[in-house]
Structure formats: C-alpha cells, structure tokens
Swiss-Prot record:
It comes from Arabidopsis thaliana. PANTHER family: LOB DOMAIN-CONTAINING PROTEIN 4-RELATED (PTHR31301), LOB DOMAIN-CONTAINING PROTEIN 5-RELATED (PTHR31301:SF103). This is LOB domain-containing protein 9. InterPro entries: LOB. Pfam families: LOB. The gene is LBD9. It comes from the Eukaryota. Belongs to the LOB domain-containing protein family.
C-alpha cells in the first residue's frame, strides 16, 4: 500500500470549528488552536471574538510570537471564565495573597525553630 496516498484525517481546529467553516490542510491556526483545546478556545472567543483573535495572530510575525500569543489568549480566556469579575488580574491577586500567607507561615516556623534551639541550648 502506498503510504503517500493514505489520507490522515485530523479534526478541524477550534477556530475553524467556531466559525463553522472547513479547516484547510494548511490552516494557519491549527497549530495554535487544535481541536483538543476547543473549550479553552471557546472561552477566548467569548472574551475577544474570533475576528479579533485572527487580527492579533496575523499581527504576530514569527512562529514563536504566535505560539506565545495563542497561549496568552487561551490563558486569558480561561482566567475570565474562572473569575468573570477580575479575570487574569484576579488570579494574580490570589497568587500574591497566597504568597503573603506562606511568608507569614514561614516566619512563624522560623520563630518556632529559634525558640526550640534556645530551649535545646539551655538544656545543654
């Protein structure tokens, strides 16, 4: 059997699926918005709209830039899905708050260690 004649079907990318159009074999957006990430893309689509996503992706000239941009678009969409009031800013606030709590906990542990060392030195 001639391997070159075998048609490998891939699912249409999330962008083409959202636009209800046929996804061409050399779709510019398939590497960045594969079918497996459809849910993430839908979140981004609700936030930015497909036409704005296309404009942003076309503005990024290099593959590395497009890769980072697509990742950012998907993350921002998910952030707004999880926190509709604050989006990515809310996630950053939450992480900063968690860091502050961990710092307080770490300082408490350091203080306990200091006290235990002093007790141990007094016993010797």
């Amino acid at each position: 059997m001639d391997v070159s004649r075998v048609n490998v079907k891939r699912a249409p990318c999330a962008l083409c699926t959202t636009k209800n159009k046929r996804c061409p074999k050399k779709c510019d957006f398939a590497p960045y918005f594969p079918a497996e990430r459809k849910g993430e893309y839908e979140n981004a689509h609700k936030l930015f709209g497909t036409s704005n996503i296309i404009k942003m992706m076309r503005f990024a000239s290099k593959d590395k830039q497009r890769d980072m941009l697509a990742s950012s678009i998907l993350m921002e969409g998910d952030a707004w899905k999880k926190d509709p009031a604050r989006g990515g800013f809310g996630m950053i606030q939450k992480l900063k708050w968690q860091i502050e709590l961990r710092k307080i906990y770490l300082n408490e542990l350091k203080e306990k260690i200091k006290v235990e060392k002093e007790k141990t030195e007094l016993r010797l």
